[in-house]
């Protein structure tokens, strides 16, 4: 009876989900070969909700940036509900953000880390990294972009995506992670799901990890770099709200919720095409859990966007640069760092590691000429190239 009720609730949620389509459109993703379709509504796995370590048990010195205990997720600083999951590679899954009718997405709130970055024609896309827990459905899955090469190499991840432009696919195929790419082909775990006439590509992370193990490309990786601690560092400014404006069609807002300690995501619901026109927002939810999408840390990264060809950008996420980190209602001016084979880390102005709040992180990637304006506790970032 309980299982039947869960299925009914989830079906009701899927049937009610819809959105507005923006003026800006994205290039359709080419699919390769017909794959099996999901014929039953997926049920939530018990591991969909990561276990958070009680505050009193967190070490005063924090965890990281190296020598993480075997049961602590180095991407969240939290004890894993199932430490066995940490003996594998992370999974980087491309998740669509536009057009608006793909929202709400499945599984986005359950990722350890999410990167939100500009693609083309005013749109953004998510690179969601799953590691410390498994999620029964993630999607809709879309195509890869140049920046994904840096992310897959840094996080040593299994790379699940829909397709890519020719030049991007050539770079992926020539990389050292070419054997870790998983696309829509027969016998891969990427499946088609078709609610309300939409033909979505989705994946179960447990199936994706098992597929990597079967192919002999899974196993524990060195993911050192991030530092976590519960107390917020000194030197911050009030930062209970931030806006990230990518284009007239794609923009978002984060509101700090002192009860959960998370920044809750609000997404655009209409294009802003006229001077003086107000932005319009709605809370982003997770279609898998029907819960609001929120992250413990939100970090805005200033990164060079190099024009590769008309409409295609190569986002160069290596080296170091300026950044703003938001946690616990506070904003911090920091520096981001990433060597060619490492994950993203942050430092304070004095060079000491910036302490991420234990939990999940969303990185907003914007151009080097992007502007920032502060009004009281609210911060507004406007994306500008390069």
Residue ranges, per PLM feature:
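Sec-dependent bacterial lipoprotein signal peptides
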Residues: 1-16
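Short, intrinsically disordered low-complexity segments
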Residues: 1-2, 31, 36, 191, ...
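Ser/Thr-rich, Proline-interspersed low-complexity disordered segments
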Residues: 13, 18-73, 83
């Amino acid at each position: 009876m309980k299982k039947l009720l869960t299925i009914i609730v989830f079906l009701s949620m899927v049937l009610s989900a819809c959105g507005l389509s923006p003026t800006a459109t994205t290039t359709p993703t080419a699919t390769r070969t017909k794959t099996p379709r999901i014929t039953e509504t997926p049920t939530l796995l018990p591991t969909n909700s990561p276990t958070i370590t009680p505050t009193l048990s967190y070490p005063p010195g924090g965890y990281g940036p190296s020598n993480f205990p075997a049961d602590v997720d180095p991407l969240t600083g939290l004890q894993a509900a199932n430490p066995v999951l940490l003996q594998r590679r992370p999974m980087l899954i491309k998740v669509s953000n536009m057009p608006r009718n793909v929202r709400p997405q499945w599984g986005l709130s359950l990722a350890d880390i999410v990167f939100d970055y500009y693609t083309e024609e005013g749109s953004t896309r998510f690179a969601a990294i799953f590691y410390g827990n498994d999620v029964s459905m993630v999607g809709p899955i879309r195509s890869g972009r140049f920046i994904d090469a840096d992310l897959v190499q840094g996080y040593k991840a299994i790379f699940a995506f829909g397709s890519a432009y020719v030049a991007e696919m050539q770079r992926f195929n020539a990389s050292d992670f070419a054997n870790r790419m998983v696309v829509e082909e027969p016998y891969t775990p990427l499946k088609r799901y078709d609610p309300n006439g939409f033909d979505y590509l989705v994946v179960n992370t447990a199936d994706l990890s098992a597929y990597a193990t079967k192919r002999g490309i899974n196993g524990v990786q060195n993911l050192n770099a991030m530092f976590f601690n519960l107390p917020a560092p000194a030197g911050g400014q009030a930062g209970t709200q931030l806006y990230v404006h990518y284009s007239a069609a794609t923009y978002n807002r984060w509101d700090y919720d002192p009860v959960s300690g998370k920044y809750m995501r609000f997404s655009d619901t209409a294009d802003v095409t006229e001077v003086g026109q107000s932005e319009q927002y709605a809370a982003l939810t997770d279609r898998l859990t029907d819960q609001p999408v929120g992250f413990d840390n939100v970090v805005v990264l200033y990164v060079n966007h190099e024009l590769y060809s008309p409409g295609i950008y190569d986002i160069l996420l290596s080296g170091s640069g300026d950044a703003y980190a938001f946690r616990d209602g506070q904003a911090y001016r920091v520096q981001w760092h990433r060597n060619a084979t490492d994950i993203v880390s942050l430092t304070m102005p004095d060079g000491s590691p910036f302490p991420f709040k234990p939990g999940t992180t969303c990185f907003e990637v914007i151009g080097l000429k992007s502007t920032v304006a502060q009004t009281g506790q609210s911060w507004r970032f406007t994306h500008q190239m390069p």
